[in-house]
């Protein structure tokens, strides 16, 4: 949701030039500096229904190559109704891998607006691992210097989804499906080229064998 961190600034001023040490505090300027969050719902399909998947690990980064990690620490374990919460770590804290619980939902909170990359780092046996990171863009909207909502746009395998929040306790949810086996690269990538070349090679072998078989029959 939209989480304000309130900063106050006070200035003391003196009306007595002969006694500059005595100050009168001004009315504090209050500024809300917002941080943002999003929730990951990790699931697999069973009988055409979404079923939560536990034991999936994620790490968050600020770059596409996943070198600059945004370290997080677990704030709460959650329950069936509320996601397990991982907040942005403080400078003195060591980060951890965010792991989906039995109900499959984890929330990343305390984030600045901007672009992030969510990488699946641990996958349970029997399920696929995502072939690349999910790109996540957090964009706030302000009206008269007041935050009214923010959008979370996430992109994976050329599929783009936008979810938004305009309430303090509303966390935009990123839906991430796991399938059994290994996920193929998206169509149009190098994976598709490799499979196309392999298909052409197999077809050529079949045609050569067929031609040789016909020649033997004629001879």
Where are these predicted regions, by residue range?
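Solvent-exposed loop/turn and edge beta-strand elements of beta-rich ligand-binding domains
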Residues: 1-219
